[in-house]
Amino acid sequence: MNMSKTTISVKLKIIDLSSEKKEFLDNYFNEYAKATTFCQLRIRRLLRNTHWLGKKEKSSKKWIFESGICDLCGENKELVNEDRNSGEPAKICKRCYNGRYGNQMIRKLFVSTKKREVQENMDIRRVAKLNNTHYHRIPEEAFDMIKAADTAEKRRKKNVEYDKKRQMEFIEMFNDEKKRAARPKKPNERETRYVHISKLESPSKGYTLNGIKRKIDGMGKKIERAEKGLSRKKIFGYQGNRIKLDSNWVRFDLAESEITIPSLFKEMKLRITGPTNVHSKSGQIYFAEWFERINKQPNNYCYLIRKTSSNGKYEYYLQYTYEAEVEANKEYAGCLGVDIGCSKLAAAVYYDSKNKKAQKPIEIFTNPIKKIKMRREKLIKLLSRVKVRHRRRKLMQLSKTEPIIDYTCHKTARKIVEMANTAKAFISMENLETGIKQKQQARETKKQKFYRNMFLFRKLSKLIEYKALLKGIKIVYVKPDYTSQTCSSCGADKEKTERPSQAIFRCLNPTCRYYQRDINADFNAAVNIAKKALNNTEVVTTLL
């Protein structure tokens, strides 16, 4: 056995809040959000007239700066920025830039002290009433928001450039015969399909001329929408649903199941409930061990969280995270392949490494979420009408769908991890996080969008990953290519297999034991995923 570190999160719910306490907590969250949004807007205004002078090399991906005389310090250094705030543009070095626009210097512009005054239009204390420590932390939150927004904008711009490049390829294919190559016709195909000459080796089945024309129109609309969104002024309002606290601010009274946060709420007592009964002996031992681990952490902090509950009201939580060492297994008898789908929530199949075959435990998890979301769609259509009886009751029904989805995903993930632990197997899944969005078509029907929203890959896979790592079980992500089109028994490709429906897979290879037999498509895909992980082929990432 070898030890491995993993992050564990424990959430305590604050319960039995009076109306006064709720109002007090709610006001503090709103004040925190107001101050953060104010700070973000002022920082953006300050940095608006600064221009980055670095150029990135394509090969090394490193920033290159021209050397010159800094207009502030007068030394010959690398010039990183051009400051246009004080009339004439001034080219400045990294040290001078940090001295004027670094995080620490900008923070001083917002927070006044006994020895330092700030301008009235920059003073956070005039905007919101908060704890003194939070006044100093709010500029950090604002910088994080700006950084996240800029990263998202860069990603959107990159996607627009990629879409424009793809659109140009389709235009070339449509207008110039030399730029397109014909794919060999299949028996059932009426029209010839083409691919761009630069993509002859790609597995794409190609596009008909009408299909190419539709692609050009669809991608044009997509690019237009994206550019319109990029041209708008971006003002990001901070929701203020998470506040960072130092752990020593929180005082626990386990005998009464209460906490106090004197730095924020003076002597206000807040009743809590946790993942186990605080009053029981096992609960006391659990929390004693938990506090000991928390206090050993170098960065000792927690979060006060505000969430919207199923009835539309706010709920409050105290969340702690800490790193714990878990025993990682080195010896595995096989692999548990997990295929997450739409019609069925998931299929988990154990594949034995010695016998080279699928055997028990095998579990196909039904998807109750599909019915819940279909019912939700009907309710939304119903509520869109002008007059609906019992409107408030219907809205309450809508708000209760998310907790049911969360519970279903947690229950399924727990069962899958228990199966792997019992069978002494590691878990393998498809790596679909980036692939789903990239493969989306420019134009989707409402039905396609609806069924895509049924797919809970990210939510369920992250829960499986988290619960498995706590047990010391290895997670392997493999490429999703052809897992649902290849026969798990004989390895026949998509040309010798067929899918009569989404739930059924059929092999057409006469030598295969599944020849002309209808088998579960999710079972077949799960076995293929397990085989890829065991053979160490097309593995993307391995955790633990």
UniProtKB/Swiss-Prot annotation:
<keyword id="KW-0378">Hydrolase</keyword>
<keyword id="KW-0694">RNA-binding</keyword>
<keyword id="KW-0862">Zinc</keyword>
<dbReference type="GO" id="GO:0004519">
    <property type="term" value="F:endonuclease activity"/>
</dbReference>
<feature type="binding site">
    <location>
        <position position="487"/>
    </location>
    <ligand>
        <name>Zn(2+)</name>
    </ligand>
</feature>
<keyword id="KW-0255">Endonuclease</keyword>
<comment type="function">
    <text>CRISPR (clustered regularly interspaced short palindromic repeat), is an adaptive immune system that provides protection against mobile genetic elements (viruses, transposable elements and conjugative plasmids). CRISPR clusters contain sequences complementary to antecedent mobile elements and target invading nucleic acids. CRISPR clusters are transcribed and processed into CRISPR RNA (crRNA), which requires a trans-encoded small RNA (tracrRNA), but not this protein (in vitro).</text>
</comment>
<feature type="region of interest" description="RuvC-I">
    <location>
        <begin position="335"/>
        <end position="485"/>
    </location>
</feature>
<feature type="active site">
    <location>
        <position position="339"/>
    </location>
</feature>
<keyword id="KW-0540">Nuclease</keyword>
<dbReference type="GO" id="GO:0003723">
    <property type="term" value="F:RNA binding"/>
</dbReference>
<dbReference type="InterPro" id="IPR051399">
    <property type="entry name" value="RNA-guided_DNA_endo/Transpos"/>
</dbReference>
<keyword id="KW-0238">DNA-binding</keyword>
<feature type="region of interest" description="Linker">
    <location>
        <begin position="327"/>
        <end position="334"/>
    </location>
</feature>
<protein>
    <recommendedName>
        <fullName>CRISPR-associated endodeoxyribonuclease Cas12f2</fullName>
        <ecNumber>3.1.-.-</ecNumber>
    </recommendedName>
</protein>
<dbReference type="GO" id="GO:0003677">
    <property type="term" value="F:DNA binding"/>
</dbReference>
<feature type="binding site">
    <location>
        <position position="512"/>
    </location>
    <ligand>
        <name>Zn(2+)</name>
    </ligand>
</feature>
<keyword id="KW-0479">Metal-binding</keyword>
<feature type="region of interest" description="Target nucleic acid-binding (TNB)">
    <location>
        <begin position="486"/>
        <end position="520"/>
    </location>
</feature>
<feature type="region of interest" description="Wedge domain (WED)">
    <location>
        <begin position="196"/>
        <end position="326"/>
    </location>
</feature>
<dbReference type="Pfam" id="PF07282">
    <property type="entry name" value="Cas12f1-like_TNB"/>
</dbReference>
<feature type="active site">
    <location>
        <position position="430"/>
    </location>
</feature>
<feature type="binding site">
    <location>
        <position position="507"/>
    </location>
    <ligand>
        <name>Zn(2+)</name>
    </ligand>
</feature>
<dbReference type="GO" id="GO:0046872">
    <property type="term" value="F:metal ion binding"/>
</dbReference>
<feature type="binding site">
    <location>
        <position position="490"/>
    </location>
    <ligand>
        <name>Zn(2+)</name>
    </ligand>
</feature>
<feature type="active site">
    <location>
        <position position="522"/>
    </location>
</feature>
<comment type="similarity">
    <text>Belongs to the CRISPR-associated endonuclease Cas12f family.</text>
</comment>
<feature type="region of interest" description="RuvC-II">
    <location>
        <begin position="521"/>
        <end position="541"/>
    </location>
</feature>
<dbReference type="InterPro" id="IPR010095">
    <property type="entry name" value="Cas12f1-like_TNB"/>
</dbReference>
<comment type="subunit">
    <text>An asymmetric homodimer. Guide RNA is probably required for dimerization.</text>
</comment>
<feature type="region of interest" description="Recognition domain (REC)">
    <location>
        <begin position="1"/>
        <end position="195"/>
    </location>
</feature>
